[in-house]
A protein has these predicted regions:
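Bacterial N-terminal signal peptides
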Residues: 5-19
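Exposed beta-strand and adjacent loop surfaces of beta-rich binding modules
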Residues: 55, 171, 184-186, 251-253, ...
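His-enriched metal-coordination microenvironments in redox/metal-binding proteins
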Residues: 134-401, 458-459
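A short, structured loop/turn motif at beta-sheet edges
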Residues: 101, 228-232, 320-324, 349-355, ...
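Aromatic- and Gly/Pro-enriched helix-to-coil junctions and flexible linker segments
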Residues: 16-166, 173, 177, 232-238, ...
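Extracellular/periplasmic ectodomains of large secreted or surface enzymes and adhesion receptors
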Residues: 393-428, 528
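N-terminal secretory signal peptides that target proteins for export/translocation
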Residues: 1-2
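Central antiparallel beta-sheet cores of small beta-barrel/beta-sandwich binding domains
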Residues: 417-497, 503-529
Length: 529
């Protein structure tokens, strides 16, 4: 037995000894021409080329070599290419992120001393369209010339003009071209003959027509879809410039590309947002909320989150009529310097009755390196990037018909109360404004409640503090943020009747030495269905 075992053992040793030795082979050297240039050409040079917004070109080895270490640092940290959507939420057609393999290739190239490689391996640089990226437009609109002062705070002119159209047309694409990109932060074009927020208030839709910002390509709508521009249409603008020490001039042009035949679906825009907030000084994580109610079956085709320098993160979540929830967009590390649209690879369907909650956080502390003054309370404002904004815009098409149907303030609040528990939610009328202000009370016997009002078309949940119940009578305190002199702190009382109606009073809080106004309100349950 031992002899047999020994024979087997010796046979195994002999077999291994007779094999040729295994020689380790080194990984092939990573070179710029063969390995790195294709990555940069595919993902980076749309901005990193002469005449564009990036501070350096990366088209050639001579361009890239001085920046090799910085390139590695930026791509390893995933700061370049710029992209801020949570990769675990959704899939987007314009996601420019590098793969892990591409990042490893760039890292190996830099660590090896950034060798050039064989010039014969160098790919042909991509060809870019000079001038209009989408080709010659069907109509070019020139905005009035803007003169930007050499110094001072950021400059926000708002020129407007009327389109010279002989008939209504629909556009399949729009391209915005500032003439002086070195100082231009963004150019936003609105199609409303009134302010965009006034249009949002009256229709529930936000009439933004196009946006130019660093990293934002021209807008091309899905096949057969587009936006209307009308005879006599006024284009309003919001332009943003950075003074750079010398007087500058910009003349922005807008290229319109008309669709052919009948438009199958009109693309509309809407948003959740907040326009009445105040962020306290030195607040490191101040939260703002807003709600949008979907009042028809729609499909989302793009998202556009917007805040300013103190913006920290933003999340958009849908609660469907059956109670299911889905995160639509999550931007965990917002960067004001990059105003990006996010285009889903497939349309995102939202049925009628879906509630979209927008939650954003702001860092008004000294720890925020972009914060110009943490000692100030910060209000909503469009006229400066040192103020703040909170908008989660999205573009969509409606399932029914060609164009989405507009909605009134009351219809939007009716949709909201129908989405809440019927036994603890009431649609009420506040005695503010020429025709009253519809609002919603959500007052559960346990847990957190909310007082929903609407300002310029956006629904704002106001906190409910010290909610107390005694039988069918309740009382709570709230800060009523509305665009009305009656805005302020209130104690709200009310009684629920056996028939589901509610009546009560808002008592203004203030100096006890002076009488404060009070307002009566009434309303009722709005059961689902």
């Amino acid at each position: 037995m031992r002899r047999a075992s020994l024979i087997v053992f010796l046979s195994v040793i002999a077999a291994f000894a007779s094999r040729p030795p295994v020689i380790a082979t080194a990984a092939p050297e990573v070179t710029f021409t063969r390995d790195v240039a294709p990555i940069l050409h595919a993902r980076c040079v749309v901005c990193h080329r002469p005449g564009e917004v990036a501070p350096m070109a990366l088209l050639t080895y001579q361009d890239a070599r001085p920046w090799a270490r910085a390139i590695k640092d930026k791509v390893v940290a995933r700061q370049m290419p710029p992209w801020f959507a949570d990769p675990a939420v959704g899939a987007f057609a314009n996601d420019p992120r590098l793969s892990a393999e591409d990042i490893a290739t760039i890292s190996r190239w830099v660590d090896a001393g950034a060798p050039q490689g064989d010039p014969k391996d160098m790919p042909t640089p991509p060809r870019f369209t000079e001038g209009w990226q989408l080709g010659e437009p069907d109509m070019v609109v020139e905005l009035p010339e803007v003169r930007i002062p050499a110094t001072g705070t950021d400059y926000f002119p708002t020129p407007s003009l009327t389109l010279d159209l002989k008939e209504d047309r629909w556009i399949r694409a729009i391209e915005i071209r500032p003439s002086n990109r070195a100082i231009t932060h963004h150019s936003v074009i609105f199609s409303a003959n009134v302010s965009a927020m006034s249009a949002m208030s009256s229709t529930g839709m936000f009439d933004v027509l196009g946006v130019w910002a660093v990293g934002t390509p021209p807008t091309v709508y899905p096949e057969g879809t587009g936006r209307w521009v009308h005879k006599g249409q006024m284009l309003r603008t919001n332009l943003h410039y950075h003074p750079n020490g010398t007087p500058q001039v910009d003349r922005t042009r807008v290229g319109l590309y008309f669709g052919k035949g009948e438009m199958k679906k009109e693309v509309a825009a809407a948003l959740a947002g907040n326009v009445t907030f105040s962020i306290p000084p030195n607040a490191p994580n101040f939260e703002l909320r807003s709600v949008y109610m979907v009042d028809q079956d729609i499909n989302i085709v793009s998202f556009f989150p917007h805040m300013h320098l103190r913006g920290k993160d933003m999340k958009m979540t849908a609660t469907f009529p059956d109670g299911r929830q889905q995160t639509l967009l999550n931007v965990p590390a917002y960067d004001f310097n990059w105003q990006l649209f996010y285009y889903p690879k497939t349309k995102v369907p939202l049925p009628r009755g879906t509630r979209v909650d927008l939650v954003a956080h702001y860092d008004n502390s000294a720890a925020n390196k972009n914060n110009p003054d943490p000692s100030r309370a910060i209000m909503f404002g469009e006229a400066s990037s040192t103020s703040e904004m909170m908008f989660g815009m999205f573009e969509f098409t409606a399932d029914a018909g060609v164009s989405p149907k507009p909605s009134t303030e009351r219809e939007r609040m009716e949709a909201l109360v129908a989405s809440l528990p019927a036994d603890s939610s009431f649609l009420i009328d506040l005695p503010f404004g020429p025709s009253g202000l519809p609002a919603v009370l959500h007052l559960p016997r346990t847990g957190e409640g909310a007082f929903y009002t609407q300002v310029l078309g956006v629904i704002l949940p106001q906190p409910v503090a010290k909610l107390q119940w005694e039988g069918n009578t309740f009382q709570f305190n709230t800060l009523l943020r509305i665009l009305n002199p009656a805005a302020g702190y209130y104690t709200v009382t009310g009684t629920i009747g056996d028939d589901g109606t509610v009546r009560g009073k808002l008592q203004r809080l203030g100096n006890n030495a002076r009488p404060q106004p009070s307002f009566e309100y009434s309303g009722a349950h709005k059961p689902k269905g």
